[in-house]
């Protein structure tokens, strides 16, 4: 059983604070943290909290700097960074968590110019926000091209997608959707449950998945 969020907007916290929180949670959970991050999108929530979201360009410029800072603090003894949004000098993050070289970093989103490019460089896990298999396959290929540009094997990155169990509780549809995405290289299907999150759906959903033969481990 893993622990994490899918995903936290990076603008809510300084990446140094987030790195320390991540290390602490990785320790407390016994090395089960999945660090899910994104550039941020929720204008209503950001406005309610009085946190500046910024333009799309600003969000992604800040996000890319954040990824560099996070990776440094999670893997290095000290980190020095001089960016537009963040400046660190001989910064430490100790103790680090048990997962080495760092907890898996998951980046969510499908933007081809910035999100997938940043994913190729910094992520261990990419989350596709959901859509038909053809769209997933196209985004997968864009991600692979970005990986090729920097000499990275795209197989190093886990591929996941959202699936939704509707109020009608059509378990067979969830399984069919997962199978269609699996044929295009999906590694992990993440099922969103209908509100009010009735736990009684879990057993029939698990049975449908188990009976489908889709489980690999």
PLM regions and their residue ranges:
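Active-site-adjacent structural elements that line small-molecule/cofactor binding pockets in enzymes
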Residues: 1-217
């Amino acid at each position: 059983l893993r622990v994490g969020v899918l995903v936290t907007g990076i603008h809510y916290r300084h990446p140094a604070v987030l790195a320390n929180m991540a290390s602490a949670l990785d320790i407390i959970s016994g090395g089960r943290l999945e660090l899910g991050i994104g550039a941020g999108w929720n204008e209503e929530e950001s406005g309610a909290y009085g946190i500046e979201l910024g333009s799309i360009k600003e969000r992604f410029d800040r996000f890319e700097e954040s990824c560099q800072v996070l990776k440094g603090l999670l893997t290095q003894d000290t980190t020095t960074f001089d960016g537009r949004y963040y400046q660190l000098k001989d910064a430490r993050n100790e103790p680090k968590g048990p997962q080495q070289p760092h907890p898996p970093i998951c980046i969510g989103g499908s933007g081809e110019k910035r999100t997938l490019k940043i994913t190729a460089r910094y992520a261990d896990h990419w989350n596709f926000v959901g859509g038909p298999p053809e769209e997933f396959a196209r985004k997968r290929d864009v991600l692979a091209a970005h990986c090729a540009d920097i000499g990275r094997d795209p197989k190093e990155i886990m591929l996941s997608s959202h699936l939704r169990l509707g109020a009608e509780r059509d378990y067979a549809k969830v399984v069919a959707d997962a199978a269609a995405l699996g044929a295009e290289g999906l590694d992990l299907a993440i099922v969103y449950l209908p509100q009010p999150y009735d736990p009684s759906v879990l057993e029939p959903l698990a049975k449908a998945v188990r009976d489908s033969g889709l489980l690999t481990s």
